[in-house]
């Protein structure tokens, strides 16, 4: 699920089993394609959340720049049982107030973020394999 307000984009995921500790490797990655262009970013994703997780309430947000993931800021998150919420600053990832459209994907325990085959081979993804969720708000 995704939602937004003036300041943040919010993401929620619910898993079948309790979510593992944030200290696990390759834990609960949130991949965001802000420009909805598969030809930009890493495998089309412009931002990744949770590539490095310093605490049980704060995580990192990284952007794909010069063929590498670069830290650009932090995001708040909470885990309770099998649910996880993340709040990402719109300003941090370039989500303008006038337009709210992006693609996103969750990936847990994939081994190589640069290999698209990982989405079908290792770990779990939502949605499956190379599919993305699309979030779009119609402006009135």
Predicted feature residues:
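A structural detector for short beta-strand units
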Residues: 46-47, 82, 131-134
């Amino acid at each position: 699920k995704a939602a937004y307000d003036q300041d943040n984009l919010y993401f929620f995921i619910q898993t079948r089993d309790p979510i593992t500790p944030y200290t696990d490797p390759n834990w609960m990655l949130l991949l965001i394609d802000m420009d909805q262009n598969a030809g930009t970013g890493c495998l089309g994703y412009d931002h990744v959340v949770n590539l490095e997780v310093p605490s049980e309430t704060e995580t990192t947000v990284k952007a794909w720049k010069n063929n590498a993931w670069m830290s650009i800021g932090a995001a708040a998150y909470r885990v309770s049982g099998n649910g996880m919420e993340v709040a990402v600053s719109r300003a941090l990832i370039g989500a303008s107030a006038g337009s709210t459209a992006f693609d996103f994907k969750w990936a847990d325990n994939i081994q190589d973020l640069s290999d698209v085959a990982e989405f079908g081979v290792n770990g779990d993804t939502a949605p499956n394999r190379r599919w993305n969720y699309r979030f779009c708000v119609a402006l009135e």
